[in-house]
Amino acid sequence: MRQRPPFIVSASDLPEHSHAYPQSDEPMGPSRRLGAAAGLVRLGINLQRLPPGTRSSWPHAESDEEEFVYVIEGAVDAWIDGTLHRMVAGDLAAFPAGTGICHCFINNSDREALLLAGGEAAKAVNRIVYPVNPSRRVDLKESDWWHDAPARELGGHDGLPDALRPRKDI
């Protein structure tokens, strides 16, 4: 059998990477960097696993990088500008650059979810804003913070998975 070219990769052959934001011990859902492994440099494509009670990232918006998330398996809550929207397998959410649409994905279900997340790879001109976590600004270079992000009204949800809230029945 012929060896496959390096731009054909199998997700199962790639390590999972997980991260937590500085000054936080909350792990974000682990992902496999498919695009980078296949040699893409201008497009990031990640296979992200969201166990119950986790989220993809902190709520954020980007100035110059388009992003998308496609639900492969399970169900997640798309946190869009402070309001939750249920997404199931086959649903896609797209975030055009510069709109200021703040987003993250939360697994409040009791089953694991699998997402395909993609977007333009780190552009030097891109800026980011974390409206629910303004303390994140101190972890970034001043030039990386999106100071003039479009003002968008935020709903009442705080962007946290239900599992991170104190239980009321105790």
Region roles according to the model:
Residues S57, H85, N126-I128:
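Short beta-strand segments
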Residues M28-R33, N46-E62, G100:
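Conserved short histidine dyad/triad with adjacent acidic residue
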Residues P30, V41-N46, E65-E67, G74, ...:
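A generic structural signal for short beta-strands and their flanking turns/coil linkers
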Residues L47-P51, A61-W79, G118-A121:
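Short, conserved beta-strand element in jelly-roll/cupin
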Residues A97-V125:
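Ligand-binding loop in jelly-roll beta-barrel domains
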Residues G74-V76, G90, F105:
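Short hydrophobic/aromatic patches on the structural cores and recognition surfaces of FHA
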Residues M1-R42, I128-I170:
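A short, N-terminal "cap"/entry segment at the start of jelly-roll beta-barrel domains
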Residues G82-G98:
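Short acidic-glycine-tyrosine-enriched beta hairpin
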